[in-house]
Every structure is written in structure tokens, then in C-alpha cells.
Amino acid sequence: MLEFYGKRFESRLLLGTAQYPSPSILADAVRASLSRIVTVSLRRESGEARAGQDFWALIKALGVAVLPNTAGCHTPREALTTAHMAREVFGTNWIKLEVIGDTDTLQPDPFGLVEAARILCDEGFEVFPYMNDDLIVAERLIEAGCKVLMPWGAPIGSGRGLNNPYALKTMRAHFPDIPLVVDAGIGVPSHAAAAMELGFDAVLINTAVAKAGDPAAMARAFALAVEAGRLAYEADPIEARDMASPSTPLLGKAFL
């Protein structure tokens, strides 16, 4: 069972709530995904206050855990301010910490990320840092107090899947006891299954579901892929080989 900061969940699929065509389609997708955790962004525009209230009511009606994020923040100061606002609005110490370093690739800023993570952990937040796949950055985040890591598979919204499976596999081996979630870049269910087969604890999906022709059906497909990938990992799959290995034994075979 998936566990974050002492809370346990049956589903290993986390779902983002942005970019859906309508609130009802979002609700259908969340239900179809069987996800018990959704990420939400704090809306700061006062003109959208009523829309924000309706959205929050919808999320509460779904009965899922909420993971607020600091999407769009480019400095530690911005991220800290957003995190404090999110804690007040959503009533949770959880925060998905994003400090973006590049506007083209949306690659996280590792220096600002570690700085913000250290401050937030000291203030009692339970931090889920969106990071690259660098082991040293991961070490620094753990030292700062993070008990979950969320390395990217590929740039946000790119749908490219796992750009560097070797780095992700190495991270899994290096941190066997830290919950790891592939966050960003997943495009199709097979990408999610591949991440789970590497031993990752969960995946976070948003664009691949929200922008699909049928978001609810895609959410269900991802749920099945995540389950299949986890089962495959637990079943201890065979190692890839460069040469063939016969699957049919020669014992008992007639030689003519």
C-alpha cells in the first residue's frame, strides 16, 4: 500500500486537476482513475473567487486527499508565500513544491528547490518536491527534511515518457526506503507502467488525462497500467539479455 507521511492509500495513481474541459469531466476522470490523491493549484485571481469555491466544493465532494502545489513559482520566496496560502485555504500541511528554473523546459531550479524545502520542512510542512533526476539534489532534499521525492520523467506536459530510465532506476536503487513518484512527462499508460516496473511507488498524471479525447477512459487506462506495472515489479521480472535463451527444454525431445 502507498504511504506518504504516515497516511496510507490503496491507489498508486495521483491525478492532477488542471486543464479539464469541464468540472463534470474532471469528476468523472477522478472517479475512473480510482485515485485517492489529487493535486490542486491555488488560484490567486480575486475575480475567480466564486469559481474557486465551486472547484473546492467539487474536490471535497469526491472525498479525495488534496495535495496543493506551488505551480508557476520561480523563486523560493514565491513558493513559500504560495505554500502558506495553500495551507490556510486547503487545511493541509502537504505541499507539492515547485520552483521553476527555466520557462521553456519548466525544469525545476534545484538550488531554489532545496532552499525552499528546508524552510518549509522547518515550518511543519510535509513537502513533495518536484525535482529532476539528479541524485545529489535528491540527497540534499532528504537532508532538508523531505520524506518523498518526485523526479520528473520528462518536461511537464511533453508526453515524452521516461527520458532517462537509467537515472530513475539508479535513484530507486539509491533510495530504497524513500517513496518515489514519477512526476511530469508521462504521455500514455505504457509510460506509467514502465515507471512502476522500475520500482517507483506511484506516478502523477495530469495533461495525459485532461487533454485526452476521453479523459475518463484514459484515467481508467492509467489506473490499470499503474496496477499492472506494480504487479510486474513485485513479481520480479527477468533481466533483459543480449542473446536468445530457448524457452523449450531439449529434454525428452526426439532426435531424428
Swiss-Prot record:
Domain of life: Bacteria
Protein EC: 2.8.1.10
Active site: 96 (schiff-base intermediate with dxp)
InterPro entries: Aldolase_TIM, Thiazole_synthase_ThiG, ThiG
Alphabetical GO biological process terms: thiamine diphosphate biosynthetic process
Subcellular location: Cytoplasm
Gene Ontology CC entries for this record: cytoplasm
Keywords linked to the UniProt accession: Cytoplasm, Schiff base, Thiamine biosynthesis, Transferase
Chief location of this protein within or outside the cell: cytoplasm
Reactions mediated catalytically: [ThiS sulfur-carrier protein]-C-terminal-Gly-aminoethanethioate + 2-iminoacetate + 1-deoxy-D-xylulose 5-phosphate = [ThiS sulfur-carrier protein]-C-terminal Gly-Gly + 2-[(2R,5Z)-2-carboxy-4-methylthiazol-5(2H)-ylidene]ethyl phosphate + 2 H2O + H(+)
Binding-site residues, 1-deoxy-D-xylulose 5-phosphate: 157, 184-185, 206-207
Entry GO MF terms: thiazole synthase activity
Associated pathway: Cofactor biosynthesis; thiamine diphosphate biosynthesis
Similarity comment: Belongs to the ThiG family.
Role summary: Catalyzes the rearrangement of 1-deoxy-D-xylulose 5-phosphate (DXP) to produce the thiazole phosphate moiety of thiamine. Sulfur is provided by the thiocarboxylate moiety of the carrier protein ThiS. In vitro, sulfur can be provided by H(2)S.
Self-association state and partner proteins as the record states: Homotetramer. Forms heterodimers with either ThiH or ThiS.
HAMAP family per the UniProt record, alphabetical: ThiG
Protein name: Thiazole synthase
Species assigned in the record: Brucella ovis (strain ATCC 25840 / 63/290 / NCTC 10512)
